[in-house]
Curated annotation (Swiss-Prot):
Keyword vocabulary terms for this entry: Cytoplasm, Methyltransferase, rRNA processing, S-adenosyl-L-methionine, Transferase
Similarity comment: Belongs to the class I-like SAM-binding methyltransferase superfamily. RNA methyltransferase RlmE family.
Main location, first listed in the record: cytoplasm
Catalytic activity: uridine(2552) in 23S rRNA + S-adenosyl-L-methionine = 2'-O-methyluridine(2552) in 23S rRNA + S-adenosyl-L-homocysteine + H(+)
Top-level taxon in the UniProt lineage: Archaea
One cellular-component annotation, GO: cytoplasm
Annotated S-adenosyl-L-methionine binding sites: 50, 52, 67, 83, 111
Gene Ontology MF annotations: rRNA (uridine-2'-O-)-methyltransferase activity
Enzyme class: transferase
Listed EC numbers: 2.1.1.166
Compartment list: Cytoplasm
Catalytic residues (positions): 151 (proton acceptor)
Organism: Thermoplasma volcanium (strain ATCC 51530 / DSM 4299 / JCM 9571 / NBRC 15438 / GSS1)
Name of the protein: Ribosomal RNA large subunit methyltransferase E
Amino acid sequence: MTGDRRDEYYWKAKKEQLRSRAAFKLEFLLDRYRVVRKGDAVIEIGSSPGGWTQVLNSLARKIISIDLQEMEEIAGVRFIRCDIFKETIFDDIDRALREEGIEKVDDVVSDAMAKVSGIPSRDHAVSYQIGQRVMEIAVRYLRNGGNVLLKQFQGDMTNDFIAIWRKNFSSYKISKPPASRGSSSEIYIMFFGFKAP
């Protein structure tokens, strides 16, 4: 094993023909926490280049993937290129669900993140804003009992973020997968058992 995890997981992804090393983070989280189960319908936010999508595609019955950047096609995956902060995102998701014959989804997962600035407080604040938007989308489209998985840079607003949203769910977990760099403040927050209004 090299001293740099980025090298280890980069080459492992290449060997296994995965589009990004982030795939191993999701594999770890799914194996340990079962956030997504076989046959689930999933909305994936921040999908490009498709590492998570490849992993999800072996498990989910239907995936609607969303990203601001283009993503090379993956068979069986519905891709929406859109900024999640634009109000048109709801029309786009509504249309995709309707055309796929889905009323509500089982899970919403997100690896979305803006380009890192290198200033921890700024990166945390941006990740908080993205997380808020992911949760707004999640509570709109999740079925009763559904789950959420999202990335955030840990910081002084993390506890507030969890406090805001945990009341809508039965439980939550926080994890940092082995494929995450040790020096990174990156964490993954999972909410389980959505309590539909």
